[in-house]
Amino acid sequence: MDCGPPATLQPHLAGPPGTARRPVAVCQQESLSFVELPPSRLCVDLFPIAPEELQAPGSRWSLATPAPLQGLLWPTSPGGPDTHIASTSGGMRPGRAGSWPHCPGAQPPTLVEPWSSQHMQPQRRASHSGSEKSAWRKMQVYHNEEATGTETPTGLLETGQAAQEQALCALEPGPQELSGNARGGLEAPERRRFSASELMTRLHSSLRLGRSTATRVLTSGSGAGAIREGKLPVRESRRAETRADSVSLPGPVDLNEVHGGLVEPRLDTQDKPTQDPSSATERRQSRFLLNSVLYQEYSDVASARELRRQQREEEGPGDGAEGAEEGPGPPRANLSPSSSFRAQRSTRGSTFSLWQDIPDVRGSGVLATLSLRDCKLQEAKFELITSEASYIHSLSVAVGHFLGSVELSECLGTQDKQWLFSKLPEVKSTSERFLHDLEQRLEADVLRFSVCDVVLHHCPAFRRVYLPYVTNQAYQERTYQRLLLENPKFPGILARLEESPVCQRLPLTSFLILPFQRVTRLKMLVENILKRTAPGSQDEDMATKAFSALKELVQECNASVQSMKRTEELIHLSKKIHFEGKIFPLISQARWLVRHGELVELAPLPAAPPAKLKLSSKAVYLHLFNDCLLLSRRKELGKFAVFVHANMAELQVRDLSLKLQGIPGHVFLLRLLHGQRARHQLLLRARTESEKQRWISALRPSSPQEDKEITCDGEDRPQVQCVRTYKALQPDELTLEKTDILAVKTRTSDGWLEGVRLADGEKGWVPQAHVVEISSLSARLRNLREYKRVSNASSKLGDPPA
């Protein structure tokens, strides 16, 4: 049935030249208010039709309702065509400007039968109470549009009408949901509301049917040709997919799942008996992923928050005092987003940055009953989920924007591409499954959810993808540097990709190191959860198991990276070091380089009189390994000739702190023993104080028990916290991340210190410019308590202390 205007009216309906066609009705509100429209003539500017054609009974522009259209564009009243729905009293609710086409001096066109006198007054539906109105604003009704296929337009509209009427009946509230003073006479107005909504939907549907019919006629030839060539019309297929995804009629909406006006996906609807778990994870849309920030930004914000926590301790005792976390939670004002790190994030941040910001949590009243420790425990769990979403966001950018770049793929060879990106897609898939399980756990019980068992369950999968990726880090770095130097197209293509707002102008290297950063951060997040669990509880046991599994994974990753670097370094040195005497087997899996460098050997001149000491200086090069020391002289072409070597047990070092008479510089004495006697004795001079202390510390290493005493028993021992990341340049240095806390062991006057990291017990040298002193005694004591808390929990499982 042709419902459109005659062909002669098409130029008039198209509007003046140069103007775009606009839809008949547009609404962007969450809730609509439909008002009865007074009778009037059709706007002659919009419909230039002869008056006799409007009065003709059979004309398509007659004001009377055509019989074929009754019940199609709007349902027929049960009492016949003249039956009207009674309206309630009340003033007119102003509509939105531009909702209907209008012209000066004319009312909106009449779309229904001739009006009776009772419709002359403005009418509206009755108002609901605040709760019902808020609930109805969160519900949206969609109409099933299936305008493709071989069905006739009439059949399609009848099918859509039946499906929509069923959905509307299911969504219509019962009388018990309305307030008592508005129950009487509200059944008909509510039916009136949905009739108006149904009217607008079907008007849009009829317009789309006309356009889709014309489109099918115009594109039938080209579409058939594309199919014969084995190609699908991409534009039409995407349009069909969009309609199929956005127009399907939803079932009854559970208002308990609505957060902030958005309907959240339910996990139970994703579980089907014949559904593959991986496909369910891919089809399920994360509630945090779409609006999450990049992981690089999250790391900066989280580090700044931890630094502010230490600064608050500097200003005065806070919640770190003993027993402070057992009291009631902070006041409501302190739980607002403005006092959290969400105020520091960008506008593209995640929907809820804090667990306490979730509407279900705020509305439950549980915040008033939880202690400060319990609040921090839930926030630590929630941060693990939101940070994982941020991590996947960055991985998606790395895989989609960089790895998926056609231009970059054409520039790189297959082997270079494999070495540069390694197993990054597999890491992303594993993290997506992990986030899927975490969100299911959160949605199951948002008030008392747990995550450590989920972490423990995924640790084997983490090991399968993280260990190969981190092990490949050395090849990855070398491949990146080689491509910059040898591939002329690579720097330009990479620069264009890095300038894109998709990656927020961050370099590719910041994305490639994310897996190693994440596995370390994941251990830290689980450690924060463990610190706040009740001692002896089941939660503590599960958190300890998850922490131990992640700690073991991090240790394996570090050992794998160090093993490759150490082996390559030994192979490189074996080609340069030559022994004058017997052959020394340098390459060994149990050996690694600790420190190397050149010092000045001082020796008295034989002809010098004893009263006037004169010293000769000679350069000597030291290669210190974990089990032996090699002393050599430099030769041509960068080679070394070893003249003496000794085991670590045969070394004795002494710091000559007081300057010897006539011997300037930073001097220390090195003895190579043979039994109880000194086989060789060398007076060595370093260039700086820190160089001398670093050599003394390396030649006389402390035992693990001594390092443990520094971290556990030294309540008055100084502590520092990293404020700037530092990458170790020498084997005896320590790589630092922001917020790392060190117990200071040795300081030098030229700006270096040796410390032991509380988190893992690693020891090394770092520049003082990258750390700040923790002067607050309460903050230092709290750091030691947290360290002992984790160590005691780990010892219950038989693991070595963290």
Swiss-Prot record:
One of its GO terms (molecular function) is GTPase activator activity. CDD domains: PH_ephexin (cd01221), RhoGEF (cd00160). This is Rho guanine nucleotide exchange factor 19. Coiled coil: none annotated. Keywords: GTPase activation, Guanine-nucleotide releasing factor, SH3 domain. Gene3D superfamilies: Dbl homology (DH) domain (1.20.900.10), Pleckstrin-homology domain (PH domain)/Phosphotyrosine-binding domain (PTB) (2.30.29.30), SH3 Domains (2.30.30.40). Residues 1-21, 77-136, 173-192, 218-286, 307-343 are annotated as: Disordered. GO terms for biological process: regulation of actin cytoskeleton organization; wound healing. It comes from Mus musculus (Mouse). Highly expressed in intestine, and at lower levels in liver, heart and kidney. Residues 715-776 form the SH3 domain. Residues 592-704 form the PH domain.
